[in-house]
From Swiss-Prot:
Regions crossing the membrane: 4-24, 41-61, 99-119, 141-161, 171-191, 226-246
SMART domains, sorted: RING
Single GO cellular component term: endoplasmic reticulum membrane
Top-level taxon of origin: Eukaryota
Membrane topology label: Multi-pass membrane protein
Biological role stated in the UniProt entry: Probable component of the HRD1 ubiquitin ligase complex that mediates the rapid degradation of misfolded endoplasmic reticulum (ER) proteins, a process called ER-associated degradation (ERAD). Targets the misfolded LRR receptor kinase BRI1. Functions redundantly with HRD3A.
Chain segments carrying region Disordered: 339-378
Signal sequence interval, chain numbering: none
Subcellular localization(s) per the UniProt record: Endoplasmic reticulum membrane
Molecular functions (GO terms): transferase activity; zinc ion binding
UniProt-listed Enzyme Commission number(s): 2.3.2.27
Organism lineage string: Eukaryota, Viridiplantae, Streptophyta, Embryophyta, Tracheophyta
Key words, A-Z: Endoplasmic reticulum, Membrane, Metal-binding, Transferase, Transmembrane, Transmembrane helix, Ubl conjugation pathway, Zinc, Zinc-finger
Stated name of the protein: ERAD-associated E3 ubiquitin-protein ligase HRD1B
């Protein structure tokens, strides 16, 4: 702030000196203005004064609507400003035939308006994460967003009018596209803020807020991607390859692809939550911590994940919109399809007999509880069992496994390898399969829970 005041004071002093020299040396108004507009030094000083006036107006708007900036907002502003400046310099090279003082003024105006949008977005994010916000802060941010939306609409309308009058792809296309992007971004910020206010009025109990926010961001990214594609094709057909749009186009496409993938995954998981995730029993709620780790509130009813952790159904639904893992242990909420198919394909006779025994003993009341404990005990070793079975099946199909079916393949494909290396590989794999076989034997031994289950079933 102090540096801006010093810079503005020196620029004002230089401008006054230049104007005084022009009128004192020329004596009349018209010769003095011609001298000021034709002299390069005078023109640079006057343009610098115009930049000072724009920065002063920008700073005034910031003070009125936002007040003092936080450190995170200043950091965001500096990062975005340098990146946007490089992209604008690339854009200037495309529209070099339209390069003039007016074009530079419009570019500086665009950069300053983008800075206001960045600060508005960051301030809304800060308000959403702050527990107590004053009424004045809400009024200022709402007024600021409405001001930005009106400004975006006016500048978009002006750029479209210039584009219609010129009837060709010129710098008006660039500014029209930029202000349309800013307008859609401002609308999305306003709607997102409205969602926040609605949730605040409902005391944080609006379960539909994450869903509507997700749809809003999906539609916003779709609109941005469509506009980027149209502008890219228009510039490419009239001027050449727009280098400054490649990064924005790629990031927008990547964000849209990620959101569509997350949406499909979310719909797949939440389509049958009641069937996929069972309800927690009162015994499970009493034996475990009955506090939901997502909302930090007590649970009277909850859903149980595969890993055994309990959560509110609406908290779990909100969490699954962003993550596919358990909030507590980071295990996958839904196992991968390839792991499931591998486990089903490598299911051994012992596992099938164990499932049959469990199903037989479930007819009795006590036998059902014991079989449930046995299945829970088996689930703890299921991952190791699947890994061992998969490794055994892979080893059996490999060329190292000694069988008559793969002798020819081994001799043809590895005839050039030294015998010492072949023997070392064979001994290593044989030791690994021996370890896996021992693990399988340990898993096949009946545990204490299984023995009790069998005795209870026999007694019944």
């Amino acid at each position: 702030m102090i540096q801006l005041k010093v810079y503005a004071g020196l620029s004002t002093l230089a401008t006054l000196v230049v104007i005084y020299h022009a009128f004192s040396s020329r004596g009349q108004f018209y010769p003095a203005t011609v001298y000021l507009s034709t002299s390069k030094i005078n023109l640079v000083v006057l343009l610098n004064m115009g930049l000072v006036l724009m920065l002063s107006l920008w700073n005034l708007v910031k003070i009125v609507f936002l007040g003092s900036l936080r450190e995170a907002e200043v950091e965001r502003l500096n990062e975005q400003a340098w990146r946007e400046l490089m992209e604008i310099l690339f854009a200037i090279t495309i529209f070099r035939q339209d390069f003039s003082v007016g074009f530079i003024s419009l570019v500086v105006t665009l950069l300053l308006i983008k800075g206001l949008h960045w600060m508005a977005q960051k301030r809304v994010e800060y308000i959403e994460t702050t527990p107590s916000v004053t009424l004045l802060s809400h009024v200022r941010i709402v007024s600021f967003m409405v001001f930005l939306l009106i400004l975006d609409c006016l500048l978009t309308y002006s750029s479209i009018q210039q584009l219609i009058q010129s009837r060709k792809a010129s710098m008006s296309v660039f500014f029209t596209f930029e202000y349309m992007i800013l307008a859609t971004t401002t609308v999305s910020i306003i709607v997102k803020y409205a969602f926040y206010v609605t949730d605040m009025l409902k005391e944080g109990q609006w379960e539909g807020k994450p869903v509507y926010t997700f749809y809003l961001e999906l539609v916003r990214d779709l609109l941005h991607l469509s506009m980027y594609l149209c502008f890219f094709l228009m510039i490419f057909m009239n001027y050449g390859l727009p280098l400054h749009l490649i990064r924005e186009l790629y990031e927008t496409f990547r964000n849209f692809k990620i959101r569509v993938t997350d949406y499909l995954r979310y719909r797949k998981i939440t389509s049958n939550m009641n069937d996929r995730f069972p309800d927690a029993t009162p015994e499970e709620l009493s034996s475990n911590d009955a506090t939901c780790i997502i909302c930090r509130e007590e649970m009277t009813s909850a859903k149980k994940l595969v890993c055994g952790h309990l959560f509110h159904v609406h908290c779990l639904r909100s969490w699954l919109e962003r993550q596919n893992t358990c909030p507590t242990c980071r295990a996958l909420v839904v196992p991968a399809e390839n792991a499931t198919s591998t486990a089903s394909g490598n299911r051994g006779p012992h596992q099938e007999s164990l499932q049959q025994g469990t199903g037989t003993s479930s007819s009795d009341g006590q036998g059902s509880s014991v079989s449930a404990a046995a299945s829970e005990n088996m689930s703890r070793h299921e991952a190791r069992f699947q890994a061992a079975a998969s490794a055994a099946s892979i080893y059996g199909r490999s060329i190292v496994y000694p069988s008559s079916a793969n002798t020819l393949v081994w001799s043809q494909g590895n005839s050039l390898l030294p015998q010492t290396e072949v023997e070392a590989q064979r001994r290593f794999l044989e030791s690994q399969i021996e370890v896996l076989t021992n693990q399988l034997r340990l898993l096949e031994k009946p545990t204490t829970v299984d023995t009790k289950g069998k005795s209870v079933a026999d007694t019944a």
